[in-house]
Amino acid sequence: MTKGAAADQDRAIAWARDNGINFFDTAASYGNGTSEVNLGRALNGNTDGIVVSTKVGLSNDDLSDIAGSITRSLDASLTRLKLDHVEIFQLHNTLGHSNSQGMLNFEQVMDEVIPAFERLKKAGKVRFLGFTAKGDTDDLHKLVECGSFNSAQIFYNLLVPSAGETVPDNYPSDDFRKLIDVALDSGVGAIGVRVLAGGALSGNENRHPLGMPSVAPIGSETDYSTDVQRARQFIPLIEAGYAASLPELAIRYVISNPVLPTTEIGIATLEELQQAAAAVNKGPLSDDALAQIKKIQAAFVA
């Protein structure tokens, strides 16, 4: 919710609440705080029965004062959200071992991020601690197993199924090595994200005018166009009647995972929200559809 008319955004939030959707996730970086401002306006302090989560992403300039940067980011987020606390506060950085912008190593998270998060929890500003699981898979596994986090946002979709199932070594996307199961075995709540692969699973290369103008490839190691081309390989399942559209197929694929407790879907309009809810209400895909999907995914391997 970074673009569009305020009245339309308010209607989308109201519709979501009226229809049993109770998890609202945002981040300081979404629209440079605009998403938080819009969500705060729509909620107007009324969080009865819902979970609000936000995230902090540290830049290289923040690394000299990680604890202070985290605290300042959360305080600014709470001001924009018009709240005195959030249910879940999440780290929004890539884990790795380079000096790339926005990348943290495992030791920085353990030694500096987690203590800062714990202090904010003790102060009553957050209830639960989480992180976005992107980056080095070994580090992500260690992080969900470290005992300090309550939740992890995990990439999982038709193009990137590895968080939920074993894929070949040469599968052309990140291999998260069944991170969903690892998280749940460690007592960490798994939240499925990037369900539509940043929009690629719409099958349309043209970005929605209210969405992000561009995204990095999620389902391939090449570019967004390649992601879209791979997404179109699932169109025969639509033609065969397994789902009414590619987005519906993508959403129902994710909720077909029997152990994934929560799925998060990014939306730009009320219409997209209603379509996503309708897809969820249709339930998991049939076993035959899932078998056809596995065959298509296997063909992605070079």
Language-model features, listed with the residues they occupy:
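Active-site mouth loops of central-metabolism enzymes
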Residues: 1-7, 56-68
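N-terminal binding-site loop/beta-alpha segment at the start of enzyme catalytic domains
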Residues: 1-51
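Acidic (Asp/Glu)-rich catalytic clusters
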Residues: 17-18, 40-48, 78-83, 144-147, ...
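A structural motif
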Residues: 18-21, 83-86, 126, 149, ...
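Alpha-helix-loop-beta-strand connector modules within alpha/beta enzyme cores
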Residues: 36-54, 110-123
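A short, structured active-site edge motif that brings together acidic residues
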Residues: 49-61, 91, 158-159
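Active-site groove signature of glycoside hydrolases
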Residues: 78-103
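Beta/alpha (TIM)-barrel catalytic core signal, keyed to glycine-rich beta->alpha loops juxtaposed to Asp/Glu
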Residues: 94-301
